[in-house]
Design a protein with these regions (language model features):
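Internal nucleotide-binding/catalytic subdomain
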Residues: 154-278
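A conserved helix-loop-beta module that forms one wall/lid of the active-site cleft
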Residues: 94-177, 183, 321
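Short glycine-rich anion-binding loops that position phosphate/pyrophosphate groups of nucleotides
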Residues: 16, 76-78, 146-148, 276, ...
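Active-site "cap" helix and flanking loop/linker of ATP-utilizing ligase/carboxylase catalytic domains
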Residues: 235-257, 274-339
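ATP-binding N-terminal substructure of ATP-dependent carboxylate-amine bond-forming enzymes
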Residues: 1-97
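Peripheral (often C-terminal) accessory segments that flank ATP-dependent C-N-forming ligase machineries
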Residues: 297-416
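Hydrophobic anchor at the start of a short beta-strand
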Residues: 28-31, 92, 119-120, 141, ...
Length: 416
């Protein structure tokens, strides 16, 4: 498929600049929009993507709609817009209404149960007062902030009230007068390993090849390619089948990820649904592992089903952070020939140099492709050694632990 005369328009919230840039490898142009409507806009979001290797940063989304051959919306919080665009005949690739499975966790758990997936013990708690009581009475739960307050706190493990109280105090402070309106989804802590299915759904049909990955937040992700349904571990197939009715109902054609826990009983429990590109590692890997990436995105937008092409068996993304990046622009340097393998997060290019955009401490992921776990790990380490930034933090120990988790997962039926 020749897309060299096509124009792409990307509506992003700032995290998927590299995926927008990947389209430029095959398209005539890529216009990149990040919403910045604020009374007193800071220079940060206004600059994301500017000067970045041919990407054209635009200040208006609506003015460019009718010039685009297809539209790409990689993130969530955009369901109404994506559905409106579809309803008005625009070719758009985005999660749409199905994103509620991710954003409304209680809804997601409810649909999961209705679709026949096993469900761990789960409680819906409203307000910090009720949460304190729950935490005083219960131990060993994973607590997630739900509804419109997700941004005020990361999910956290609750073992006893003494350990969790400071986090609850923090949430109460951040929520202010709304502290009794915050909804929490409290889920039983489960034993076992936590792989994730990272795929593309076509209205409930999982497109092959697809991948499963083991991820450690702040460290990275190791992924393995599966060429067919027969090759895919049964646990991952069951998870996909449990989500498929939702994708079919919403006519979802997009990327998604589903993390699940599995132990020696080999029963998969869905932990998190990500109905968008999964950041940072999965999206970074997909942009290079999928050789016909632009064709796939174009097909998702236009209704032309296009199977992804993957010529490698394994992939790895290692995360790079810097404490300085949350405070100021951080210069990131690497050899020119490394550009394809360094996937920046919120970034700009100014006067020939690459910078991360504050206040986000995640700088980039360095990726590698290969035919064994050992190969992708060694290649990624060689590449990371060539990247420089102030206060650069890389968790190699986390990558080693992932390799141990892969071996454990094999005992539970996750062939890797």
């Amino acid at each position: 498929l020749n897309l060299s005369n096509k124009k792409a328009l990307v509506y992003d919230l700032g995290l998927f600049t590299e995926n927008a840039l990947r389209l430029l490898r095959d398209c005539a142009s890529v216009e990149y929009y990040v919403p910045t409507r604020e009374a007193f806009p800071a220079p940060y979001k206004v600059e994301i993507g500017s000067g970045l290797d041919g990407l054209e940063r635009v200040d208006s989304f609506e003015e460019h709609l009718d010039r685009a051959d297809f539209i790409f919306v990689p993130d969530t919080q955009c369901a109404a817009m994506v559905e409106w665009l579809r309803g008005h005949g625009y070719p758009v690739a985005g999660a749409g209404a199905a994103e509620r499975l991710e954003l409304d966790r209680w809804h997601g758990r409810t649909r999961q149960k209705e679709n026949g997936l096993p469900v761990q013990e789960t409680h819906r708690i409203k307000g910090v007062t009720a949460l304190r009581k729950f935490c005083a009475d219960r131990k060993d739960f994973y607590i997630k902030v739900d509804n419109n307050f997700r941004g005020i706190s990361e999910s956290f493990k609750h073992q006893d009230l003494r350990a969790s109280e400071s986090r609850i105090d923090y949430i109460a402070h951040k929520a202010g007068p709304y502290k009794e309106d915050v909804v929490f989804v409290c889920e039983e802590l489960l034993p076992g390993v936590e792989p994730g299915l990272d795929g593309i759904t076509w209205e409930g049909e999982l497109l092959y090849p697809t991948t499963i990955g083991y991820e450690s937040k702040g460290s990275g992700i190791i992924s393995r390619v599966y060429g067919s349904e027969r090759e895919l571990p049964e646990a991952a197939r069951l998870i996909d089948e449990g989500l498929a009715p939702e994708f079919k109902r919403h006519k979802t054609r997009f990327f998604y990820s589903a993390e699940f826990k599995i132990d020696k009983d080999r029963v998969p429990y869905l932990i998190d649904s990500t109905i968008r590109l999964a950041a940072p590692g999965v999206a970074a890997i997909q942009s290079e592992l999928i050789e016909n990436y632009t064709e796939v995105v174009y097909g998702l937008a236009t209704g032309e089903k296009t199977a992804p092409v993957m010529k490698h068996k394994y992939a790895l993304a290692i995360s790079m952070d810097s404490s300085e990046a949350s405070k100021t622009f951080v210069n990131i340097t690497f050899p020119k020939e490394m550009r394809r393998w360094v996937k920046l997060r919120m970034a700009v290019r100014h006067r020939g140099d690459y910078y991360s955009v504050p206040p986000f401490d995640s700088l980039a992921s360095v990726i590698s492709l290969g035919e064994s776990v050992r190969e992708v790990v060694e290649t990624a380490k060689e590449r990371i050694a060539q990247v420089e930034a102030i206060n650069l933090n890389i968790d190699f120990a986390g990558i080693e632990k992932l390799q141990e988790e892969i071996q454990e997962g094999k005992r539970y039926g996750i062939n890797f």
